[in-house]
Amino acid sequence: MRHYAAYGSNLDPDRMRAYCPHSPMVGTGWLEGWRLTFAGEDVIGWEGAVCTIVESPGDRVFVALYDLHPWDAAELERVEGVTAGTYRKLHVRVATLDGEVTAWVYVFAGYEGGLPTAWYLSELANAAQKAGAPDDYVAQLRSHPTRTASA
């Protein structure tokens, strides 16, 4: 299996191309029964929390699917913090217009909770927009509460 389902800043095809130049975006879809949330505030050295997903019946998360080339896999795991234990890799089913696809995602390895910074939330919403997420999904991201940055 080579499909990677991106739900955060890696929704942006330009960002992914910088880390994974051999791994094109091949489509989009939804993780049914999952919810986008935030976690790890003050844990990984950021000002705010980072995005992750948690199982949540009735919810869904927009994803971009990438055909991840083996040459790019190690770099992506390093960038996503898998090798440091910050994120863990899970296999999921992605609902697409062509049917279900099996892919993997990276999920934060710690607790759920915390608020993202306004800058980070804007990056996520912009990435979702670039990947073709529906307008209401992007608007929902943009309206999420944010943490006030420290001085």
Model-predicted segments: where are they?
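Glycine-aromatic micro-motifs
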Residues: 1-151
